[in-house]
Amino acid sequence: MRVISQDGTIDVPYDYFSLSMSSGKYKDVEVAYIYCYNLSSPNGTKLAEYSTEAKAIKAMEMLREQYARIEIIKALVSGTCKHMEESLEPEEFKNILKKYINMEVFRFPQDDEIEVVE
C-alpha cells in the first residue's frame, strides 16, 4: 500500500517505513504531527499535521483500518481472480479492479476532514 502525505508531496510504501505521531503545544496552540521514518530518513519526514492529538490518532486509525481491509481482500481474492474475470461483465470487473487499486493508496486527510467524538 502507498501512503501519501497530507499535501500530496510525499509518497511512501507503507511496508518499508515506520510511522509515528508526536504532539504538543506551539505558541499555546495544540498541534500533532505524523512522521515517517526509515534508514534514509532517520530524523523523520512530516506526512501530516493536525490541530489535536485526537485527530492525529484518528488519522492513524484510518490508515491501519484501510491496510487491514486490503490484507483481507488480498486473502479473499487470491486464486479467485480468474473466476471473477470469467463470471463478471467486463465493465463490472473493471469497476471492482478500480476500487481495489484506489484502496491501495491512503492519503492523510486534511484536519477539517476528520471528526472526533470527545
Regions found by a protein language model. Give the residues of each.
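Eukaryotic intrinsically disordered, low-complexity regulatory linkers and tails enriched in Ser/Thr/Pro
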Residues: 1-118
